[in-house]
């Protein structure tokens, strides 16, 4: 995870300001912003305050001859950066410094930045789709859409930027689309898609193929696991089968389709022993040659994007409460949060959660320096 390479990529982002008016370099402003967000900054004022407090420290890493820009300058400059160029730099950085093996599951999922809407300019909240390496807990790419419904068109754009050869790509039911399946196959990856009512004929075929009797006593490859936590007990049954002859026509519609998969969960509250457990059935299709156990692992890994990314963004970084919305700033700040999460996740020396790492970085320059050194910047 080389931060030095990130700064090399960032240095090619065009600065559209008039050169003779530039007092603070774009690369320095971005460096300041990234360091500040690593240390818990949530606003432009926080970034300015961090810079004023750590100016001597920052001078070791960048050009701050003219001191720290005021928060209005930081906001104006960052909000004018091209999101496309920024995302290109981010993805190229991750491609340079992060290698993932063929067993990785890449979870693609979207998240709405709730307070990024701007009533005065009649702009709705933006929706950011992230590609998350579940093996390494790292964001490897992101793209913005204006609405969740636009995920269908945005996911192929995100895939265009990624190297997915040999990887399994997982999405929720929104991403279960024939065009997306074909694209993943063309790029050398495999898909594992959740199936719901948006694919009516496919969903009905699952219901007919896997009646309740089959779920209670599966004839196909199956794998069960149980878990107790928070006063609840959950038993999960996973079933995988080849596409049967009577459903072979689906293999012509869905490029590379090999497996039909079912996940059944029985959830009960331990204190309420007499209560019937709640049963949930979920259907999936996959082009990967999965066993029931590998299927169980893959769908469990998919939820890492919620637990290890979206939860951190909301609860630790307060993303949903962030009202930064000027120009392209909401989208850019989202990407900078992803950079901060990746860098802090890469730190294996201080074994603590993200919140403690951010606080320690804010209070301890030596720790912040070690985090940066661990990311190739010293």
From Swiss-Prot:
Give GO terms for biological process: DNA transposition
Lineage, top ranks:
Bacteria, Pseudomonadati, Pseudomonadota, Gammaproteobacteria, Enterobacterales
Look up the domain of life of the source.
Bacteria
What is the official name of this protein in its record? Answer: Putative protein YbfL
> Its encoding gene is what?
ybfL
Molecular function GO terms recorded: DNA binding; transposase activity
Q: Which Pfam families match?
A: DDE_Tnp_1, DDE_Tnp_1_assoc
> Which species does the entry assign this protein to?
Escherichia coli (strain K12)
The UniProt family comment states: Belongs to the transposase 11 family.
The record's annotation in InterPro entries points to: ISAs1_transpos, Transposase_11, Transposase_11-like, YbfD_N
